[in-house]
């Protein structure tokens, strides 16, 4: 039997997939919960419950999975619209502000989220926080030749920034765009996500950071009640 966290992820992935309609251009997110959603979309295409779906992926990993499942794919440049994007998050606060980028895919994730007519975030209840960055580091994608300079400027903003190192190769993590990632912690968390998102992105050498502000239209939360997995439609505050 799946553990409780997996059950929560499965429940919320199914609930999100129920919003997918025939003929949609669908933003396919990254991460473990989004992967379950992609698998369900593939299953519904195979058995005819869904037809004429076109996917736009947010990571190479998601592209591989979707292709294996037979989901037709297009690049972001090849489509005029995204009807619905479904993606996970590493942290979600009560105002639907997010930190994403644990998988170093936040640049493409943000591009897809901004293009989407509707952006639905799928998380399990462990991802809900009162303030961002108290438990999860903020990813900042930087040009390889500028990471030390950006690190210094982030420190001037009060952040502690470390270069993300790879787990199964020597050296740093390299993003799908060929850049590096600084993981940043701010003492006391982030009290102004919108302002900090803009400030960081204005640092020369920064491509994008993992703060997603004003993008999420809905947050679906997988949770366990009385031992049974269910889904809550989070109310924005």
From Swiss-Prot:
EC number in record: 5.3.1.6
Keyword Cell inner membrane: no
Pathway: Carbohydrate degradation; pentose phosphate pathway; D-ribose 5-phosphate from D-ribulose 5-phosphate (non-oxidative stage): step 1/1
Location of the active site: 109
GO annotation, biological process: D-ribose metabolic process; pentose-phosphate shunt, non-oxidative branch
Any GO CC annotation of this UniProt entry: cytosol
InterPro entries: NagB/RpiA_transferase-like, Ribose5P_isomerase_typA_subgr, Ribose5P_isomerase_type_A
SUPFAM superfamilies, A to Z: D-ribose-5-phosphate isomerase (RpiA), lid domain, NagB/RpiA/CoA transferase-like
Keyword match Isomerase: yes
Listed GO MF terms: ribose-5-phosphate isomerase activity
Pfam families: Rib_5-P_isom_A
Transmembrane segment boundaries: none
PANTHER family assigned to the protein according to its UniProt record, in alphabetical order: RIBOSE-5-PHOSPHATE ISOMERASE
The protein's assembly and partners: Homodimer.
Protein name: Ribose-5-phosphate isomerase A
Organism: Synechococcus sp. (strain RCC307)
């Amino acid at each position: 039997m799946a553990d409780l966290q997996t059950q929560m992820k499965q429940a919320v992935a199914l609930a999100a997939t129920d919003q997918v309609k025939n003929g949609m251009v669908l933003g396919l997110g990254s991460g473990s919960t989004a992967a379950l959603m992609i698998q369900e979309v593939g299953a519904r295409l195979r058995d005819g419950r869904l037809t004429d779906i076109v996917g736009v992926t947010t990571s190479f990993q998601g592209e591989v999975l979707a292709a294996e499942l037979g989901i037709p794919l297009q690049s972001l440049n090849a489509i005029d619209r995204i009807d619905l994007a479904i993606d996970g998050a590493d942290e979600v606060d009560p105002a639907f502000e997010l930190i994403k980028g644990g998988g170093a895919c936040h640049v493409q994730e943000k591009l897809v989220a901004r293009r989407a007519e509707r952006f639905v975030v799928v998380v399990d209840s462990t991802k809900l926080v009162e303030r961002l960055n108290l438990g999860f580091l903020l990813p900042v994608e930087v040009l390889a030749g500028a990471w030390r300079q950006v690190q210094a400027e982030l420190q001037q903003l009060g952040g502690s920034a470390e270069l993300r190192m790879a787990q199964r190769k020597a050296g740093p993590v390299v993003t799908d765009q060929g850049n590096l990632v600084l993981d940043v912690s701010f003492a006391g968390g982030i009290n102004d996500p919108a302002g900090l998102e803009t400030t960081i992105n204005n640092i020369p050498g920064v491509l994008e950071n993992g703060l997603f502000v004003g993008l999420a239209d809905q947050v679906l939360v997988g949770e366990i009640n009385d031992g049974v997995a269910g889904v809550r439609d989070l109310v924005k505050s």
